[in-house]
């Protein structure tokens, strides 16, 4: 058992204060040490969103190339697929997959807003108010939701960090997909691409692909791996980690919706089963690799946005409001505090939401 001279309160447990080393010492020295200095979270949000838009255009061009390179359906038949043999073909089920994605998009926006309210409560800003108070509606949308059993993450800036993690994972997956679909052309299994239409205006088709997320454009042959599965799995991972902090029911609901979406994709012959399985694995692995960090995205990814001449500053302003203040306790004082909390829990059946939220924000005052 490692014994530290002092501790700080932190959601994962007792750890040495991360700000024990001054920022100047932490990032001074060699060129690479300076490059590892984290960018401001607001800068990361803006720049990674710009990068995502650029990647979307790259993918749109890749879809254009893939459409032209797709094997002739009259000559090359679809590949054998065990999923096609096990699941009965139901034409048009891909529409329900799009509905699942739309539902999860709305739920993710709602969850992100609830995370923002948790952040406001953590820093002491309180709940916002609507110009006109509507009974029930204001309480539902503007009240703070916190599932204490599933909350193991620092609440300050949690909404910003969650968005950075989501958008960087999505951009990485789409960029890799742009390479994969161009490299190997597979015969299309769905009915819509058995007689693929000719693209008359490539530029217009690329723009429509970006604006409608592929829904209003022409593209066939983009099989390995499934873009629909990527966004379904991203929403699944987002709610499995962050949605569970807001309400326990988000995990089972999103899991059922995502699995139904996978079924719709295979049953409609929109993608091969391998397209779905590979997309699930890559999305989960990427989301875990990006991780949740108080500094935002991993420093290796931040290197790609440092060169942008706009959209935010490259250095953090060390102000009193932005600098976390660590609350340190000696081990004897910490044991005494734990005893007091245990006594309250036995006497009153638990601690209040305010106290629980205070200890989730315990690293800040």
Swiss-Prot record:
Query: What EC number(s) does its UniProt record assign?
Result: 2.7.8.27
Q: What is its main location?
A: Golgi
Q: Where in the cell is it found?
A: Golgi apparatus membrane
Q: Which residues cross the membrane?
A: 45-65, 93-113, 166-186, 230-250, 252-272, 276-296
Keyword hit for Transmembrane helix: yes
Any one Pfam family here would be PAP2_C
Lumenal-facing ranges: 66-92, 187-229, 273-275
Please identify the protein, giving its name as recorded: Phosphatidylcholine:ceramide cholinephosphotransferase 4
């Amino acid at each position: 058992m490692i014994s530290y001279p002092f501790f700080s309160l932190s959601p994962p447990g007792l750890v040495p204060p991360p700000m024990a080393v001054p920022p100047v010492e932490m990032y001074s020295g060699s060129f690479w040490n300076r490059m590892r200095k984290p960018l401001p979270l607001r800068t990361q949000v803006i720049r990674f969103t710009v990068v995502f838009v650029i990647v979307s255009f790259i993918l749109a061009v890749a879809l254009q190339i893939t459409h032209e390179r797709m094997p002739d359906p009259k000559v090359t038949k679809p590949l054998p697929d065990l999923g096609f043999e096990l699941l009965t073909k139901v034409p048009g089920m891909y529409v329900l997959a799009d509905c699942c994605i739309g539902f999860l998009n709305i739920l993710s926006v709602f969850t992100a807003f609830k995370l923002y309210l948790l952040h406001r409560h953590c820093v002491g800003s309180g709940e916002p108010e609507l110009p006109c108070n509507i009974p029930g509606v204001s309480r539902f949308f503007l009240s703070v939701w916190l599932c204490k059993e599933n909350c193991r993450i620092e609440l300050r800036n949690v909404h910003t960090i969650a968005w950075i993690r989501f958008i960087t994972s999505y951009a990485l997956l789409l960029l890799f997909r742009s390479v994969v679909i161009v490299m190997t052309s597979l015969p299309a299994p769905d009915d819509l691409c058995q007689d693929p239409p000719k693209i008359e205006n490539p530029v217009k088709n690329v723009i429509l692909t970006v604006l409608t997320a592929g829904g209003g454009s022409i593209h066939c042959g983009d099989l390995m791996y499934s873009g629909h599965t990527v966004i379904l799995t991203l929403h699944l991972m987002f709610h499995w980690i962050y949605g569970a902090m807001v309400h326990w029911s988000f995990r089972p609901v999103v899991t059922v919706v995502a699995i139904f979406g996978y079924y719709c994709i295979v049953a409609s012959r929109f993608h091969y089963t391998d397209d779905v399985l590979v997309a699930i694995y890559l999305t989960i692995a990427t989301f875990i690799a990006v991780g949740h960090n108080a500094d935002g995205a991993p420093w290796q990814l931040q290197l790609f946005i440092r060169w942008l001449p706009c959209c935010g500053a490259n250095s953090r302003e060390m102000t009193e409001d932005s600098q976390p203040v660590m609350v340190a306790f000696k081990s004897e004082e910490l044991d005494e505090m734990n005893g007091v909390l245990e006594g309250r829990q036995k006497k009153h059946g638990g601690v209040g939401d305010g106290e629980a939220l205070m200890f989730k924000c315990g690293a800040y005052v």
